[in-house]
Swiss-Prot record:
Keyword Ligase in annotation: yes
Name used for this protein in its record: Serine--tRNA ligase
Assembly: Homodimer. The tRNA molecule binds across the dimer.
Function: Catalyzes the attachment of serine to tRNA(Ser). Is also able to aminoacylate tRNA(Sec) with serine, to form the misacylated tRNA L-seryl-tRNA(Sec), which will be further converted into selenocysteinyl-tRNA(Sec).
Pfam families in the record: Seryl_tRNA_N, tRNA-synt_2b
Pathway membership: Aminoacyl-tRNA biosynthesis; selenocysteinyl-tRNA(Sec) biosynthesis; L-seryl-tRNA(Sec) from L-serine and tRNA(Sec): step 1/1
Length: 425
C-alpha cells in the first residue's frame, strides 16, 4: 500500500508516477477522500475528549440527583450517540482504502518508462550462445525419453499439468537440493518449509489481493493456494517489530506453487513453461530502507549464480514501468536461453518492493534503545523455478541420440548419474 502522507505532500509527483504506470491522475480524489476521513477522525477525537472530561466530572459529583448531574448525563448520552454515528461514517467510508488497495507501487527513478516488455532495458548477459546447438524442444525430448507425461496427466488433472518419471523426477529433486544448498551455504539464506495454504489477509499483505483475485486458486474453506512462496515468507514478519541488528533477514523456501494463469489462454500451451502447478525455490529478504538497493543486487546475484553453476546462458533485463509487477518498485528479470525456442525466456524475477508490502502487513524495525519504528523493506527473487530450469537443461544439454547430459554440478546430486537415457517400461 502507498503512503497516504507522501501522496498528500507530493500530489504532482504522485500523478506523474501514476502516469508512468499508465494510470490516470488520482491525487485530487485521494486528497478529497483523505480530508473527509481526517475530519471525521478529528471529530471523533474531540467527542472522545469531551466524554472523558464530562465522565470524570460525573464520577466526582457527590449528588447523583441534582439538575447538573442529570444534565451531564444527557450530555454524555448525546456524545455517545454522535460517536456511534461518526464511527459508523468512518467504517462506511471505505472508498479511500479501496482505491489505495488497487494502486500499484511507485516506480523507482531508475526504472525506464515503457508500455510493455519490448521497452525493457538490457543490463548484462552471461555465457555464449551456440548457433549450431541441437534445437529440439524440452517436451519433445522428455516425451521421447518416456519420462515426461502430458497425455495421461491431462486425463487426471486437465491441461497445464505434467507428470515426471524416473530420472527426470530425480533431476527435479536434485535441482531442489542443489539450489537450496547454494542459497543457504553461499548466500546465508535461512531455510524455511512454509504452508502453501494461506488466508486472504496473507495474500493481501503480499500484494496479491484484491487486485489479482482471479489469478489464484481459492478453496471452499477460506484458504488460497499460494502462487509463490513469497506470500508465506514475507508474512513471517507481519505485525512484528524487529530489532535493527537482526536485519537483513534472508529466507529461502522450496514449495509447490499454484496459478490459474487467467489471461494466458493460448500462450505456452505445450510443455512445462506455464503450468497450473509447479515447484519453485523462492528467496525473500527483509532489510532497512538504506540497504534495500544493495540487497536487491545481492538477491539477484544469488538467483543468477544458479544459472552460472549450471553453465546456462542468460541475460538480465531491467523491467520498464509497464511490465513491472504490482508490488514492485524495481524489478530485474533473468531470462535464460532456450535452444529449442531460439530465444530468451523469463526464468526469474527479482524485485525490490520497498515498504509497499510492509505497510500492508505492519512490519517494522527499531534501533537499539529507541522507541521509534520504521517500516522495513521487502525483496523477493525466484531462486529458481524447478520446471523452467529443467526445460533449460534439457534443451541445452541434449545429445544427438536424444539423451541428456547431466550438468557437472548436479552429478553428485544425481547419485553419480552422468546421462539421462530413454526409459523402457
Amino acid at each position: 500500500m502507498l503512503n497516504i502522507k507522501w501522496i498528500r505532500e507530493n500530489q504532482e509527483l504522485f500523478d506523474e508516477k501514476l502516469s508512468q504506470r499508465f494510470i490516470e491522475p488520482m491525487s485530487s480524489k485521494i486528497a478529497m477522500l483523505d480530508e473527509e476521513k481526517r475530519k471525521i477522525t478529528s471529530l471523533i477525537q474531540e467527542f472522545q475528549h469531551a466524554r472523558r472530561v464530562k465522565s470524570k466530572i460525573l464520577g466526582n459529583m457527590t449528588s447523583k440527583s441534582s439538575e447538573e448531574f442529570e444534565g451531564l448525563q444527557r450530555d454524555v448520552k448525546h456524545i455517545n450517540e454522535k460517536l456511534e454515528e461518526l464511527e459508523k461514517d468512518l467504517n462506511n467510508n471505505n472508498e479511500l482504502n479501496e482505491l489505495l488497495n488497487m494502486l500499484p507501487n511507485i516506480p523507482d527513478d531508475e526504472v525506464p518508462y515503457g508500455i510493455d516488455e519490448s521497452m525493457n532495458k538490457l543490463v548484462r548477459t552471461y555465457g555464449e550462445i551456440n548457433p549450431n546447438a541441437l534445437n529440439k524442444q524440452h517436451f519433445e525430448l522428455g516425451t521421447k525419453l518416456n519420462l515426461m507425461d502430458f497425455e495421461q496427466t491431462t486425463k487426471i488433472s486437465g491441461a497445464r499439468f505434467v507428470t515426471l518419471k524416473g530420472d527426470l523426477a530425480k533431476l527435479e529433486r536434485a535441482l531442489i537440493n542443489f539450489m537450496i544448498d547454494v542459497h543457504t551455504k553461499e548466500f546465508d539464506f535461512f531455510e524455511i518449509s512454509p504452508p502453501v495454504l494461506v488466508r486472504d489477509n496473507a495474500m493481501y499483505n503480499a500484494g496479491q489481493l484484491p487486485k489479482f483475485t482471479e489469478e489464484s486458486f481459492a478453496t471452499t474453506k477460506g484458504y488460497r493456494l499460494i502462487p509463490t512462496a513469497e506470500v508465506s515468507l514475507v508474512n513471517i514478519v507481519a505485525d512484528t517489530i524487529i530489532s535493527r541488528e537482526k536485519l537483513p533477514m534472508r529466507y529461502v523456501a522450496y514449495t509447490q506453487c499454484f496459478r490459474s494463469e487467467a489471461g494466458s489462454s493460448g500462450r505456452d500451451t505445450r510443455g512445462m513453461i506455464r503450468l497450473h502447478q509447479f515447484g519453485k525455490v523462492e528467496l525473500v529478504s527483509i532489510t532497512t530502507p538504506e540497504e534495500s538497493q544493495n540487497e536487491h543486487e545481492y538477491i539477484t546475484n544469488a538467483s543468477e549464480t544458479i544459472l552460472q553453476k549450471l553453465n546456462l546462458p542468460y541475460r538480465i533485463m531491467l523491467l520498464c514501468t509497464g511490465d513491472m509487477g504490482f508490488a514492485a518498485k524495481k524489478t530485474y528479470d533473468i531470462e535464460v536461453w532456450l535452444p529449442g525456442q531460439k530465444q530468451y525466456r523469463e526464468i526469474a524475477s527479482c524485485s525490490n518492493c520497498g515498504d509497499f508490502q510492509a505497510r500492508r502487513m505492519k512490519a517494522r524495525y527499531k534501533e537499539f534503545g529507541s522507541n521509534d519504528t520504521t517500516l522495513v523493506h521487502t525483496l523477493n527473487a525466484s531462486g529458481l523455478p524447478i520446471g523452467r530450469t529443467m526445460v533449460a537443461i534439457l534443451e541445452s544439454y541434449q545429445n544427438e541420440d536424444g539423451s541428456i547430459t547431466i550438468p557437472d554440478v548436479l552429478i553428485n546430486y544425481m547419485g553419480g548419474l552422468q546421462k539421462i537415457t530413454t526409459y523402457s517400461e
